[in-house]
Design a protein with these regions (language model features):
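Active-site-proximal helix/loop capping residues that flank conserved catalytic or ligand/cofactor
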Residues: 2-3, 55, 81, 154
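Short, flexible loop/turn motifs enriched in small residues
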Residues: 38, 49-56
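A general structural motif
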Residues: 47-50, 76
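Short conserved beta-strand segments at catalytic cores or DNA/RNA-binding microdomains
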Residues: 56-62
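Mg2+-dependent endonuclease catalytic cores in nucleic-acid-processing enzymes, primarily RNase H-like
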Residues: 63-167
C-alpha cells in the first residue's frame, strides 16, 4: 500500500541503493559526531519543466545539508532565476545544476547573470571522474561505473552508509 499509493520506495529491498535508516542516521549527524559545518557552500539544482516532475535544490555547507526546497509548475527561466537569487542570498560558492535535457535552458539563463556565484553544469551521462583511479584494489573507477551519474550516486550512497556506521 505505502509503496503503490503513497509513493514510498521499497526501501529495505536488496535492490535499494540507499537505505532509509542510513538517511535517518544522517540527520544532524554532524552534531552527534561533534563537528560543525565547514567548507564550501554548494547549491545543487535539478530543474524540471512545467509537468508533474518537481524542481529541487539542496544547499550544503561542506558535508552538512542545511536546506532543501522543491516546487512544481514553473518554467525553466523562472526556476533558474529563483535558484540564482537564492544562491546569492545564501552566499553560495557555486551552483551545480543538471545541464542536459531541460537543464540546457538553465545553462543559457545562468550565462546571462552578472553576479558572482559560479555555475557549473553537471552532465549525468558524462565520463567517469578519474577513470584510471582505483576504486578498490582490483577495480578502477572506469570498471565500476558507466558514467558520472552512477559514480556520483554511489558516492552519495557511500556517505550515507559510512555516516550510519559512524553513528
Amino acid at each position: 500500500y505505502r509503496h503503490i499509493w503513497l509513493g514510498e520506495p521499497v526501501a529495505d529491498s536488496e535492490l535499494s541503493v540507499i537505505k532509509p535508516k542510513w538517511i535517518d542516521a544522517a540527520i544532524d549527524s554532524h552534531i552527534k559526531l561533534g563537528f560543525e559545518a565547514s567548507g564550501q557552500r554548494i547549491l545543487g539544482f535539478d530543474v524540471a519543466d512545467e509537468g508533474d516532475d518537481a524542481s529541487a535544490t539542496i544547499l550544503r555547507h561542506g558535508s552538512v545539508v542545511i536546506d532543501m526546497d522543491e516546487w512544481r509548475g514553473q518554467d525553466v527561466i523562472y526556476s533558474a532565476d529563483k535558484v540564482y537569487l537564492y544562491g546569492q542570498d545564501v552566499k553560495a560558492d557555486k551552483i551545480i545544476f543538471d545541464s542536459i535535457g531541460v537543464g540546457a535552458g538553465v545553462k543559457a539563463q545562468f550565462r546571462r547573470k552578472t553576479g558572482k556565484v559560479q555555475t557549473i553544469g553537471f552532465n549525468a551521462g558524462g565520463s567517469v571522474f578519474k577513470p584510471e583511479a582505483r576504486y578498490t584494489d582490483d577495480k578502477k573507477n572506469k570498471d565500476m561505473f558507466s558514467n558520472i551519474k552512477a559514480q556520483a550516486w554511489w558516492m552519495v550512497r557511500e556517505r550515507f552508509y559510512k555516516t550510519w556506521r559512524a553513528i
